[in-house]
Amino acid sequence: MTTVERPHSIVVTLFLFLFAGGCGNRETQQQDHPRLSPKVTMTDVTFRSSALGREMPYRIVMPSSISPGQKLPVVYLLHGGGGGYRDWTNYSDVARYAESVLILVMPEGNSSYYTNSVEHPEERYEDYIVSDVILEVESKYPVAPGRPNRAIVGVSMGGYGAVKNAMKHPELFAFAGGLSAAVDVPTRPFSIKRVSQWRFHSSIFGPSGSETRRDNDPYVLARTVDPGRMPYLFLTCGEQEGLLPANRKLAEILQERGFTYEFHTGPGDHNWLQWNAQLPNVFRSLQERMGHAK
């Protein structure tokens, strides 16, 4: 376990804060200006998800040059609430990590929390991620087989989805990363100020105190699963974020139960500026622990 808390030392401009604003900005979400280099290729693909019963898109970024027979580890990148599958390439420089040794896959998750909905049982987004997307990608592209070569990372809602689904399906992933992960969503109490949000969360997770809530609660999972079977967990959160206490709480449980994990904090709020600052740490840790991504 490693816990790293960076000193307050970063000064940024107002322009960058506005550009990298929160993941709920639908106006910028509609634009598509991926940050790529000549060393990678990017493709948008649509496939039919059996779990959802409809066509779903994803974006895949790979090295421009892959040797015949070469197989590469894969990282599934989950977007945040209000965002979409293009966000990772539009608002971060994540594509550079695919220049030589990784395949990056960004599936569409809508506002699902990557969870099978209680109120709408046809919306099986957990099954879509852990079954359909993985099967689709790894049957079509030069992906190295097996758990040691597979990671899942997300921001905000996607961070929750990455951490939760990795703990529920530890046989699938060697590494899971949550950047500003909304790990407390299943346990948030009713608030008259946020009735619509509470109602939406209830439609996905079920009533407060229900079995479906507990089954999708990272705190409950962290207290009950076998730490020895879990993937390496990477958590990070900005020091100006409302989600910091929730992530600290999860890190404390991981520490108490002997998980292999690391937890980072640093200056920043709930936005891509802060997440971009953490990407080198994420991929350093990821590449140390995945199959051939050295």
Predicted features by range, described:
Residues 10-18:
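Sec-dependent N-terminal signal peptides
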Residues 2-11:
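Bacterial N-terminal signal peptides that target proteins for export
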Residues 24-294:
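Non-catalytic cap/lid and distal C-terminal segments of serine-dependent acyl enzymes
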Residues 20-22:
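C-terminal motif of bacterial Sec signal peptides marking the signal peptidase cleavage site
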